[in-house]
Amino acid sequence: MIDFPIKYRLIKKEKYTGARLGEIITPHGTFPTPMFMPVGTQATVKTQSPEELQQMGSGIILANTYHLWLRPGDELIAKAGGLHKFMNWDQAILTDSGGFQVYSLAEKRDISEEGVTFKNHLNGSKMFLSPEKAISVQNNLGSDIMMSFDECPQFYQPYDYVKKSIERTSRWAERGLKAHRRPHDQGLFGIVQGAGFEDLRRQSSHDLVSMDFPGYSIGGLAVGETHEEMNAVLDFTVPLLPENKPRYLMGVGAPDSLIDGVIRGVDMYDCVLPTRIARNGTCMTSNGRLVVKNAAYAEDFSPIDPECDCYTCKNYTRAYVRHLLKADETFGIRLTSYHNLYFLVNLMARVRQAIVDDNLLEFRQDFIEKYGYNASNRNF
């Protein structure tokens, strides 16, 4: 029996919800949960240094297998000593399988039992990604937490298609487990799919739990369904997953969605949302989103969020940040990106305290009254 390199420790359950306070132990340190993970697609969180990420309390970041496989190449990163050394990050790293990018970015993809053939979005060359190749690339990257190769069907795909898809994803997960070269220092998570169909989510969960992964991801959400539909899927999916393993909701970063996921027992989240909207001057604040590029802030000498104690809000005004963005100065994007990332990482710290205090539902109500509720569940 393998001693898993990724371990989950439950510290406390919230009294009135399914929320749980815990920690995840990895070969590169321990981080508290629930946790939001900043996304470093190309082995960097856009415009942020590792030191800045550590300052804001991010104990784990995500890197993207598809992008790093294409450029600079996983074998080059292995020669550098792995992703941690390559990017000078000494805490935990999670890598996705590359599957989502194949389906969302690549052109002319063809899915078969063996894997996916597609056109490289950088140069148009023909590529092939299989469950075994996805694991091999991640083994070379050396991340602490890896993802099984899966298909991510659209939420409103027909039942028969989704059923075939989850059955293939289960077979791919089994193949990935067999191909995994480093089970003692890299933890491989299975990914539960099934769109909005309860019986298919149950079938997918049963298949993957029987394979005894060290953790489980919930995929196929935040892909066009409403907020209520996502909550409903979590309501019937999370209870199917083991209590002694981490639960990761993939691609979710809207603050209200994070809180609703925690209430249902989810531990980990990631999303490009905070840095993507920051590049357009959109900032998350205690009172909802604020587009600091708007003319209304040209002479506003208050912080982006007066209730925030991040580096940006302690040192700079809305007027100054607006000026930087209007002048296309990179420092402006650095400041808005830092603020948004800090906002979500700090939100999770406040959520953890609410679990300790057994008042998470009250916290949610107070937060949403000020921030707003994103019923469409759009990440953009």
Curated annotation (Swiss-Prot):
Cofactor entry: Zn(2+)
Region spans: RNA binding: 251-257, 275-279
Residues at which Zn(2+) binds: C308, C310, C313, H339
UniProt pathway annotation: tRNA modification; tRNA-queuosine biosynthesis
Coiled coil: none
Record Gene3D superfamilies: Queuine tRNA-ribosyltransferase-like
Annotated keywords: Glycosyltransferase, Metal-binding, Queuosine biosynthesis, Transferase, tRNA processing, Zinc
Cofactor, free-text remark: Binds 1 zinc ion per subunit.
Recorded family membership: Belongs to the queuine tRNA-ribosyltransferase family.
Protein name per UniProt: Queuine tRNA-ribosyltransferase
The species this protein was found in: Streptococcus thermophilus (strain CNRZ 1066)
Organism phylogeny: Bacteria, Bacillati, Bacillota, Bacilli, Lactobacillales
Gene name tied to this protein: tgt
